[in-house]
Curated annotation (Swiss-Prot):
GO terms for cellular component: cytoplasm; microtubule; nucleus; plasma membrane; presynapse; synapse. Residues 147-149 are annotated as: G2 motif. Residues 290-293 are annotated as: G4 motif. It comes from Sus scrofa. This is Interferon-induced GTP-binding protein Mx2.
Amino acid sequence: MPKPRMSWPYQRHRQASSPPHPHKEMNFFPQQPLPLGAGPGQMTFPLNWQMGGKDLTKGLNMLTLSPQQPGGKSGQQTSKGPENNLYSPFEEKVRPCIDLIDSLRALGVEQDLALPTIAVIGDQSSGKSSVLEALSGVPLPRGSGIITRCPLALRLKKKECPWQGRISYRKVELQLQDPSQVEREIRKAQDAIAGSGVGISHELISLEVTSPEVPDLTLIDLPGITRVAVGNQPQDIGLQIKALIRKYIQEQQTINLVVVPCNVDIATTEALRMAQEVDPEGDRTIGILTKPDLVDTGAEKVVLNVMQNLTYHLKKGYMIVKCRGQQEILNKLSLAEATKREIAFFHSHPHFRILLEEGKATVPRLAERLTVELIGHISKSLPLLFSQIKEIHQSATEELRLCGASVPSNDADKMFFLIEKIKVFNQDIENLAEGEEIVKEKEARLYNKIREEFKSWIVTLDCNSKKVKNIIHEEVSKYDRQYRGKELMGFVSYKTFESIVRQYLEELVDPALGMLQTVVEIVRQTFSDTAQKNFGEFSNLNQTTQNKVDSIAARAAERAEGLIRLQFRMEQLVFCQDDIYRVDLKAVREELFNPVAEHPQSLQLRLPFVNGPSPVSSITEIGVHVNAYFMGTSQRLANQIPFIIQYCVLQESRDHLQKAMMQMLQGREQYSWLLQEESHTSAKRHFLKEKIHRLAEARHTLSKFAQSLQG
């Protein structure tokens, strides 16, 4: 391995190495994991969550493991065999945790959410396959080019029984009687899924190995990273592989196991770079160094710097292993013998022996470490996992409800089915018109949306009232210049008053019609959305309803526009009851000329046309009458126009639409056509039913697991 480079965006972290342990005669095939980073003598998985209203903290505290002998050191190993009384309690607690996640994966829950797992990634020729072979005890496909073409879930189960294997993919499940069958069956599975060429697939192959010689562990093996397409490989094969790898390693539930050869520059490793992209702080990444026997003389210090986290910092640190070389594989060196040679290599190496003593070297140590990491990760993930499954289950159930039941084949049943559909739709429309519909958070009811438009109408009336005051001066001046006869100054012209009033009213027509169109569109869109929600899976029924909604909305807009224009034509009469007008006129005069209640400056603010020493002029007098008249007119229009719009656009539209929907039931010959489902609806319903079933099974599995912890 060349000199370390600082090209990665990590600072160098100097961590105190574990103190070297005094060398003693050791058994390097330990039966219990040693929890690196845990407190002395124990490993605790804290968890505080509830299921079914019960606090599971007490039950999950049972996951506090004490795998070490009292007084023992972390570098020491206990002897192998049934006499080891500490392994059994550990195994009893570890296996159920891993089985829980494996059972959820077998149910297909990974289609819906990420499960806690360890993903193994590495560049091509990094030694990834050799590491997995050493952990599993079975030969995996080897060769040049892309060998792993599908994700492989490697489920290792430690059990005192003869070796057993099982491979499953798609609808195939095959029992294996001998480890030698594994490589051939994996190749067959990959050919069946990804084709017999060099393509890859995201579809998972599951390999379960049960043996007394394997650790309790589940790993996901992913294709090796390649940079250049070779031979018949697709030109974008590198991008395809990276996309597949990223799909797994980007999940927060995944521990990334990155395999890196000792004899390459760590800064050039694509696998570590990809892990850094999705895990910038290195919180869930473990580095595995391979091929230590290929390190050039004098470069051992570089490897030690990496192992001591001084080159590329990972919070979970590094392990180092020596697996079978190519010549040893050709010589058919057994995995058991390879493990003995690995231990002897580190034990006799002047530089790497310290790593063995610190518990950071050899495949058995790696197996221990990975088991501990996976169990800790699972325990931390359980509360979120249960919450996610519950939430997705509820969402899928609601989605299935919206899809509705399957359409019956019998004509009579179709009628009742359609009646029920229309009944639910009409009730939704009724709730909208009455302001009683159920809305989601941050959404507003239809009535509130319309009310906001009516509020803007009041603002329009106020703005026009202020605008008309400026018109008075201009209109009266125009009268004085053009039409004044023998009248003395100060006499009010009623014609001028009428002209100002009518001009003011005419300017309100367009804003009123604009508000009408806005409300029509709000109601039309809401009714349309309601039809889509109820009939979305039936294209003919939905389109028929949408057409009725559009037609009724257009008729409502036309009728409301006619009434609004009629209202403004009536307003041109300029009429008010004497008693009402007298009260309004008195109020305006008192407000305008009361010297006690008003400062002189306020008069100018309200009536900017008042000028000169005598406020009582023809302009002022007309202004008083205009204010008095529009006091009542504005109040009338503020309510009358919304009344017209609300009645025509909302209330009448509701009645017409509900009647039109019921009339659809009269055409029995159209039932089949109206209830013709979208082509994808049946498939969607089937998909949702399967999803709900597996999530219900997952919730049941989690509940049973929690109950087992409670005792």
